[in-house]
Amino acid sequence: MKKSVILNLAGLLIVSFLSCNRENTNVLYRFDNIPDRIWAGEDFWTIPLEDWHIKNGRIECLSDIQQATFSVLPYILKDDDASFRISFDMGLLSKGAHDGSSGVIIGSEALEEKDVRAAVYFGKGIRMGVNTKGYAFLEQQIRQLPAGFDFSHFKIEATGSKISDGYTVGMKVFDVTGKVLAELSLKPENAVTGIIQLVNNLRNASSGNKGPKFWYDNLHIDGPKFTKIEDNSFGPVLWTMHTLSRNILKLTAQFPPVSKSENQNAQFQVKQDGKWQTLATGKMDKDARCITWKLENWDSTVDHEYRVLFDFINSMGNKQIAEYAGIIRRDPVDRPLRLGALTCQFGSGFPYSPVEKNLELLNPDMLYFSGDQIYEQNGGYPIRRTPEDTAIVNYLGKYYMFGWAFGDLMRSLPTICTPDDHDVYHGNLWGEGGINKITPGNLGGFTQTVGFVNVVNRTQCAHLPDPFDPTPIGQGMSVWYTDLNYGKISFAIVTDRIFKTSPDKVASWEGRKDWLKTPLKDPSSIEVPGLELLGKRQEDFLREWIRDWKGVEMKVLLSQTLFTNVATHHGQFDAYLYGDLDSDGWPKSGRDRAIEIMRKGFVFHIAGDQHVPSIVQYGIDNYRDAGWCYVTPAISVGYSRWFRPDELGIPVKNRPAHGLPNTGEYKDAFGNLNYVYAIGNPGNYKVVSNRYQLAQDKSSGFGMVIFDKEQRNITMESYRFLADVSGKEPGNQHPGWPFTINQFDNYGREAAAWLPTLKFNGEADPVVEIINQTTDELECSVRINGNEFNPKVFSKDIFTIRAGYPEKDVWKVIENIKPLNKQNQEELIITF
């Protein structure tokens, strides 16, 4: 993680905290000078976020769940035989419905790596504390507490020291007078290393939810075994995301839930001529806890150092200024653009370090997170749907995991981020234009309040370019569909959930209305008038977008999932499913309209969501008559899917030359024609204790897409979760990758006729549009590569050619062009 910098308010003296080993750590955390707030401070991380508060000058846990943790981030027990001591006051707030415990975990580490983020959520260490049944415990050892023990206020002390035959860890329980009431010790089998975690209601075989709730204070950390790693601290500027498009910078800084009585304002500064200049200030959104800045007339030809400054009260109760710094890189218009494409962050793989490290080595120019930045299970605690303010903080606690994992990459890389169904607490989502989901049996609409959904949109999308049409939809719900130009690539960013029609509008079968377990007798029964996928607003946007080539050479659609149904097995290896109406293979009418628009602009499609990587060429009337889609691997797979038609005896035609199984031309359950070039199926994996190995076995990973603007080539790469990209290991990528197509492969439709070969006397790479004069419909719109173009058409009608340079607004229109039977029969010279 990057170094963080703190400026002392009194003298504005800059002090840089680096990883260091002190002779003796001696730190006392008291909370008297910190205002009442949810966020405990930059030195701590609490789970669940909404259940820990600083109140009454102490830490209070209000959680009903087991294993609610308060982790200390910067002070780590290192691997040596030095001594340590930890002590803290604590007391009972409420007994709860069941007996339970509280105490501390010493030396908490995750199995997979020594990363503080992993330790916070998956660490295991030495457990000690007290139980409201009246005993103290140290692992499996128990000492009865005196009869009438006062749980309202007592003290726990944990120690470690070298002894003649190894190392010993001890625990004492004191009453308020300092009298020792219980004492235990043990010789640990393994080295005592890692973080310390205060825990409310420790999980064990006999524990349950709705246990007691405790408060904590005067946390004292002492001894030479501790080392301070300042980089482990997190906040108060948690991370930033930004985009740069058409010389407009938009940047969002994310903050934790500080007190309403504290400062809510931050500064955005850029270094100019060696000096920091404040370009903008902003006030934190009261619900989303973020600030978004929009700066126009940005010089995108050079790199800019930036920083966000924020006054806050730190973990020690002192006023300080936090600085979060990064770089706004120049627009890479003069070289290939490298896009890191990611999706689906199931918490079992957190903090996804192999993915993060490999991305850093591959050095992308920008990032795309296509959805499911959170899952409801992430963090190991349940979602809270009500009341709205609690639900929002519950969401933020899970969403902050995303920023903690990838923030160091995002601080200096333009990042496109779009929410999907799980981000708004839906397993599947058919938004129907933002309506409220009134009953559990109604699949359409949103379960959460519009205020909650707008917070999700604001935290994840506020830094995107302004929406094409910002008019709110149902209930006043915000929208974020837009376009972004970067590196001479134009990206359309759309939602394929929010406007989508619900299956219960057409489903007549028993059971789940979104699952087809067997073929329908009449497939047309689920295709009725009025069904929507992207919705009219986004279709109109795309029709306009494919004709806007100003400053760009290639076009890409970014959405959450692909426009077809590829998976054959869901959840379990042998769990066959004929058709899934959560896929965007349905509704077919809406799917076909979207693909028809896309192919006219030679648009390449990148999506996620499916948990199995694939490369698919779409077909509408015939196989392969439209564009290509790359579905990227999930960062960390929870719910597995497979595409295994060969095992089911499903007929295949035209298998690719590589001969890999489960590839070729297939028709899906809804009649969509799909050419599957590559599929990254998981095997019949077994659950293993190593979370990263399990992610690897479940086909997790990430994608890279390289856009070569000179050749107009698009190269797709699909890296496994545990890949080593520093070398060229043959198993780094899923089978079938890497794969390269050309921009002009994204209109695969066979020609019915040809227009004359267009030859341009003028600058290279003009934009060409072909318009059918009979129907007045656009046939295609594209920036050609060079000075020559062979337009194909799909009827013998008469056509208009419109060609020119949108940057100069210089155009020529040539009408009444008759098509030819063969390519290159005639030439048409157009001079500018």
Feature-to-residue mapping (PLM):
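Short, solvent-exposed beta-strand-to-loop segments that form ligand-recognition rims
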Residues: F174-G194, P730-N742
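Extracellular carbohydrate-recognition regions
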Residues: N24-P48
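Carbohydrate-binding surfaces in secreted/extracellular proteins
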Residues: F88, A147-L186, I714
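Secretory/extracellular carbohydrate-interaction modules
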Residues: S63-L138
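Long, structured stretches of catalytic cores involved in phosphate-ester chemistry, encompassing
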Residues: G208, P212-W215, H220-P224, L244-R246, ...
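Glycine-aromatic-enriched beta-strand/loop faces of beta-sandwich-type recognition domains
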Residues: I105-K162, F670-L694
